[in-house]
Every structure is written in structure tokens, then in C-alpha cells.
Amino acid sequence: DELVAEAMRYYYFIKKGGFTATGGEPLLQAPFLTEVFKRLHAERLHTAIDTSGCLPITPAIDTLLDHTDLVLLDVKSVDDDQYATLTHGSRATNHAFLSHLQERGITTWVRHVLVPGWTDDDAMLHRLGQYVQQHSVVERIEVLPYHTMGCYKYEKMGLPYPLADVPAP
């Protein structure tokens, strides 16, 4: 109730925007977000999820997608080995998520961070373009600059930052 009330406070200021669930991994909160998105849709507010697509599709996630207007999907890399190095996860899950969005016809914006020395070479960007072209639900590709704003999270957890040697442009 509180979250929906807070979102609605901005209703008259929102011309083309809406409510975006982001931070951490919103798909981990699928049942909660489903209820929020249902309420926001009842108020005619646009809903979006900003996700890494790193989780397998579950019934709870699929139900959330029923109430999602837009997915902002991070594609870290289109190379399996590089994806695993950067995320410690499998690109197959990210790919399956995008394929599921394609099957469902859910509008998607792909986001890709240019990490110097990792994801910024011409060949990799060309592969990304070819990959995205296979999915008609992708309306936009956003190429984002690399930054080091997340370093402190690793420090607080006592973990080494995997891209510590990569300077921000």
C-alpha cells in the first residue's frame, strides 16, 4: 500500500514514464512486485523491470511478466566465457530470459555496459547487434559507460572487486 501510494504521488508529474523496479535483482521479489504492478496498472501507471535476467523463469516470474509493460535487460556479454568471467553465472540463463520475453511479446530494452578492455571492442559490439536483431521485442539498445560506483559494495562485504584494475573512462 505504501509503495503504491508513494508512486501515485508523482502520477501527475509523469508524462511518459512510470514505475521501474530496479536495484539488486527485482525478480527475486516477484510475488511482491506482482501485487504492486497489479495495483499500479489499476491506476493506469506504466510498469517496468530492470533486470540482469540471471534467474530461470518460474511461475512467479511469469505471473509478474503478465503485469510488466517493459523489461530493461542487462546483457553483460554475448560471449559465454566472458559472461561467466564477468558475472560468475551462465549466459544461457540470460539468453533463455530474452527468448522468453520474445515468446511472450514483452517490449524489451537491452542495456550493455562498455567495460574497457572487456566488452568494448568492435567485434563484440557487432556480435551484440547481431544477437539483438534476432529478437523483435527489443525496441532499443542502450550502450552505457562503465563506472566504478559499485566498488564500495564489494569493500563492505570484504570481497575483491573483480574489475578493480579497470579504470572508468
Question: What kind of feature is each model-predicted range?
Answer:
Residues 1:
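Cys/His-rich short segments
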Residues 4-149, 155:
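Conserved AdoMet/S-adenosylmethionine-binding subsite of the radical SAM
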Residues 134, 166-169:
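Short, intrinsically disordered, charge-balanced linker/junction segments flanking boundaries
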